[in-house]
Regions:
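Enzymes that bind and transform nitrogen-containing heteroaromatic metabolites
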Residues: 1-186
């Protein structure tokens, strides 16, 4: 069975996007962080996005600018299979992308049961909320960024029941980011 990992960027005050829907604040690059991001993108995993995150990612990662600034990540993001959940997107131009329709939890349950590498959710807050509530996320990798936004959308917006998590490990970076690795408690 495939694992589903949510890799999410949040501000110190818990928002994954600011009040205008922007998350450019979450992209603090330095050599240490770039090496970490590159190693994450070098695996055989698959990616899962909602439409908004997909459109943001597809507008940058397949570009020459991305290849110049973070070549390992750009290559990995384009190489990996991508599953995009959308009710409105009719076509996906980024290579290795499959549009998925229907109930998100049911479709991810099906993807998890198929053979293949793990699946990472990047961004896609509403997808994370739905899958967390359905118990379909095996690990949360939460990157806490050293910034206070004051307002925005919380990552688990819409979750109606408590989800107990166990901290497995953490890693601090020189740029101020801290990655917290959580698993749901049984």
């Amino acid at each position: 069975m495939r694992n589903v990992i949510a890799f999410e960027q949040v501000s110190l005050d818990g928002f994954f996007v600011d009040g205008k829907g922007d998350m450019s604040w979450a992209h603090k690059q330095d050599p240490e962080w770039n090496a970490f991001a590159g190693s994450n993108a070098s695996g055989d995993g698959a990616l899962l996005f909602g439409r908004v995150t997909y459109e943001m990612m597809a507008s940058f990662w397949p570009t020459p600018q991305a290849m110049e600034s973070m070549p390992a990540v750009a290559e990995g993001m384009s190489r990996m299979p991508k599953f995009v959940f959308s009710r409105t997107l009719k076509k996906a131009s980024w290579k290795n992308t499959t549009l998925v329709e229907g109930d998100v939890a049911a479709q991810v349950r099906k993807l998890k049961s198929e053979p293949g590498p793990g699946i990472a959710i990047l961004g896609s807050g509403s997808i994370v909320s739905q899958l967390a509530q359905a118990g379909l996320i095996d690990e949360f990798q939460i990157v806490v960024n050293p910034i206070v936004l004051g307002k925005g959308r919380t990552l688990f917006e819409g979750v109606e029941e408590k989800i107990a998590l166990k901290l497995m490990k953490s890693r601090a970076f020189g740029n101020g980011n801290v990655v917290l690795y959580y698993e749901p408690m049984a």
